[in-house]
């Protein structure tokens, strides 16, 4: 519903302008805004570009040509991106359990969305769109690494996300001006409804919860949430839209839950000597 008459850049700008306004209002009214340094703001600008602007422009652009199922599978690769980037930026060696859970989760999502993946394969998917999806995923992972930095400096997600969303919205505004993209609007109720849902639930609530998780259990384990998001979406679709489960989707769910169990610390014989 966000991919229609309104330009992608404009829709993403609306989303993060609304989200930034809500986040800043919340931290100011609750008195939870922390003191920050110039260096902190430099990193929050980078986080805004990686996690709250460019990555979504890339993902939305990819969504014009490839299915939501393929997007979900590609985005779940953030578990692997985070494992590699944690090693590069923070010297954290990813465990065998993290890699195993990531591969199992991605395989599970592939099975769950197998019909969509087959359809994409049959029609011939634009490699450029797949590239945009992977670029958006890699930018999201870099945003995770910056969040780890904030946590090490004692910055809470409420403060860092509020500023980062604000900077992300400013960056998007600059892109709108540079590219000459118009601020058009879709008067259909579903456009406003989906925009508010994505801004409030998907961004303010979702990212605050996710980045809090990054601070508590680390970026490697927290990234597995990106595997669970589409599973929850399919669960809601089952209840409200009558989604029909197939053998492949049921098996895929089993793989995803197995991967989630590994991340949460369930011990299997082969991984008994590894720490999650």
Residue ranges, per PLM feature:
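Juxtamembrane helix-loop boundary signature in multi-pass membrane transporters
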Residues: 33, 77-138, 179, 247, ...
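Specific alpha-helical transmembrane segments that line the substrate/conduction pathway
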Residues: 10-21, 51, 59-102, 136, ...
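Helix-helix packing/entry segments at the starts of transmembrane helices
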Residues: 12-14, 71-77, 146-169, 199-239
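Transmembrane alpha-helices of multi-pass small-molecule transport proteins
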Residues: 4-54, 81, 138-146, 161-180, ...
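Hydrophobic/aromatic residues within transmembrane alpha-helices
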Residues: 2, 11, 15, 62, ...
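C-terminal-most transmembrane helix of multi-pass membrane proteins
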Residues: 12-17, 24, 114-115, 191-193, ...
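Specific transmembrane alpha-helical segments of multi-pass solute transporters/efflux pumps
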Residues: 24-75, 111, 199-217
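Membrane-interface helix termini and inter-helical loops of multi-pass transporters
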Residues: 1-5, 64, 113-126, 177-194, ...
């Amino acid at each position: 519903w966000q991919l229609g008459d309104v330009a992608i850049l404009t829709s993403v700008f609306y989303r993060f302008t609304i989200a930034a306004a809500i986040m800043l209002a919340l931290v100011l009214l609750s008195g939870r805004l922390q003191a920050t340094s110039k260096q902190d703001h430099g990193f929050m600008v980078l986080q805004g570009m990686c996690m709250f602007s460019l990555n979504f422009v890339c993902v939305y652009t990819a969504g014009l040509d490839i299915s939501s199922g393929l997007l979900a599978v590609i985005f779940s690769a953030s578990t692997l991106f985070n494992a590699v980037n944690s090693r590069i930026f923070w010297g954290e060696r990813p465990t065998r359990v993290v890699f195993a859970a990531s591969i199992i989760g991605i395989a599970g999502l592939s099975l769950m969305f197998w019909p969509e993946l087959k359809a994409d394969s049959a029609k011939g998917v634009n490699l450029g769109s797949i590239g945009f999806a992977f670029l958006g995923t890699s930018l999201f992972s870099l945003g995770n690494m910056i969040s780890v930095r904030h946590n090490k400096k004692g910055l809470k997600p409420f403060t860092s996300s509020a500023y980062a969303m604000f900077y992300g919205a400013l960056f998007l505004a600059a892109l709108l001006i540079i590219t000459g993209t118009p601020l058009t609007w879709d008067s259909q109720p579903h456009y406003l409804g989906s925009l508010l849902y994505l801004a409030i639930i998907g961004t303010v609530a979702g990212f605050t919860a996710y980045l809090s998780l990054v601070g508590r259990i680390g970026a490697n384990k927290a990234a597995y949430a990106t595997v669970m998001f589409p599973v929850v979406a399919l669960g809601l679709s089952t209840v409200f839209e009558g989604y029909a489960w197939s053998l492949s989707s049921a098996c895929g769910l089993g793989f995803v839950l197995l991967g989630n169990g590994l991340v949460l610390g369930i011990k299997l014989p082969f991984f008994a000597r590894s720490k999650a």
